[in-house]
Amino acid sequence: MCPRYNSSHMIKKLIGRVLSGKLFKSRGKSGAHVIAFKNHGVAREAISTCVLSVTDTLQARGYAAFVVGGAVRDLLLKRTPKDFDVATSATPEEVRGLFRRSRIVGRRFQIVHVMCGRETVEVSTFRAAHDAGADSAEGTDERARTDEHGRILRDNVFGNQQQDATRRDLTINALFYNPATQEVHDYHGGVKDLHERRLRMIGDPVQRYREDPVRMLRAVRFAAALDFEIDAATRQPIRELADLLQNVPPARLFDETLKLLLSGHAVETVKRLRKDGLHRGLLPLLDVILEQPLGERFVMLALQNTDTRIRAGKGVSPAFLFATLLWHEVLSAWKPIEADGIPAIPALFKAMDQVLQLQAEKLAIPRRYGGDMKEIWSMQPRFEQRSGRRPHRLLELPRFRAGYDFLLLRCESGELDSELGKWWTQFQDAGGAERERLLMPESGPKKRRRRKKPRAHGEGASAPAAPSAQES
């Protein structure tokens, strides 16, 4: 458990020391400002016991080992970190040799996962910045590689702690905490930026965005989640370079999009993405949706509900979320297909496939999510069928609850009459007799059952055939 802090007092005290120059214990040999425990208040006990076991083991074997990145940032902001990452001078193979329950993962960026009970600690080796202009007699092509746009394809050039700090993206994510001494090492003024609530890219922002365009998304995500301002020099190139996101593999882009939408600050993130022109590189259909009054209200309601659930510690279905983002594009594609003479339901399925195929070119939505999204969408016309056995059969579907929640969102946004949502709420909560009373009368003449023809060998007519699913 993290110790309790008087956040307001600690932050004011820390800012005063930053501005007066009294914060730092010393400037270390490596060039880092070393901040003593008495000046930041983050105790060793605030770190996960599994992570402490990893850093203690590495340090006992003579390697440097620090807690790095977001965990240090969050602890200094008096937040509870979601997880803890470790950076070390040990190579992946050396780390693997120290921990029996560990494995090396990744190709673009090799790291080691160390398993400790149910916890997995991510351990990375100090990296050096890749010199895109250098070619190598030492096989640098195998350790570091960029594409024609400058995007890093492989990043396994090892270095020292200072080099590792310099190759990180934002100053606030380039802080190192030593659990043994309880000191924070700050190479790029990250602590000052934290307390001035500023996001600043390390190095030349244009070059850093070319190396990894996802850094633009990360800057916007952190700005929304932390309620920070993006430094002018860091913000300025974003709109101009947004097209570089087209070169990012769709699977990686999907992962980053999921982080954006499940951050608990999705509404603010989408607003910032639109402001910086980044949504066009992520969800090419989103701009069209948000230009439609009903579509914008629907999407924003979905994101607000998502933020509320996440902040309350409740689970969220990524499939449901993406189904809401793309629903109005499905609607827009559905009606023209139906107008071409294709029956309503086949036309709906064709529209779903079109929208998902177009989206797949930018964002690799996993098949398991795509299947769930189609189930949610395909249920929507069936909610309008409130007679006979159809409502009972709809209730039995495994994804009924997701489809029902989706229906309520459509009603709340004004797309459908709220009476339909209220009816389904009553119907699912009602008992048997009450459900029968709620059912609507069948529309149109009742279809006659067809009887099979008598058998040819004189065995008499067979029993009447059971009604088809369409008839019942």
Regions found by a protein language model. Give the residues of each.
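Catalytic cores of the polymerase beta-like nucleotidyltransferase superfamily
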Residues: C2-S472
